[in-house]
UniProtKB/Swiss-Prot annotation:
Pfam families: Ub-RnfH (PF03658)
InterPro entries associated with the record: Mopterin_synth/thiamin_S_b, RnfH, RnfH_sf
Protein name: UPF0125 protein SO_1475
Family: Belongs to the UPF0125 (RnfH) family.
Chain spans, region Disordered: 88-111
The organism's taxonomic lineage, starting at the top: Bacteria, Pseudomonadati, Pseudomonadota, Gammaproteobacteria, Alteromonadales
């Protein structure tokens, strides 16, 4: 049986390009990542967070919603990517070729 003395503090973190929010939540052992996010009420500050589909992590490692969080860990809420990384890299490479900073055939650096 767990009691109030067994509780520990977990930080829930969400960051935007211009701001970040950290909310500390006191939880019982065995609490899942998504339950901690719900308890933090981060959605009231950032309504764009969709709890059913949001990706969560612990110290930069993606975890499942039902992952049990341990003392000393923090829960990170990840935003979806705005652009496909492959497309961004391809556009950057094409721009370098057009500007003469990359070989038009191989894509490597110009000597």
């Amino acid at each position: 049986m767990t009691n109030e003395a067994d509780k520990f503090v977990v930080d829930v973190i969400y960051a935007l390009p211009t701001q970040q929010k950290v909310i500390s939540v006191s939880v019982l052992p065995g609490t899942s990542a998504i339950d901690i996010v719900r308890q933090s009420n981060m959605v009231s500050f950032f309504p764009e967070i969709e709890l059913e589909t949001v990706k969560l992590g612990v110290f930069s490692n993606v975890v499942k919603h039902d992952q049990v969080i341990l003392p000393g860990q923090r829960v990170e809420i990840y935003r979806p990517l705005i652009a496909d990384p492959k497309d961004v890299r391809r556009r950057r490479a094409d721009k370098a070729k057009d500007e003469g900073r990359a070989n038009k055939v191989t894509g490597g650096r110009v000597s």
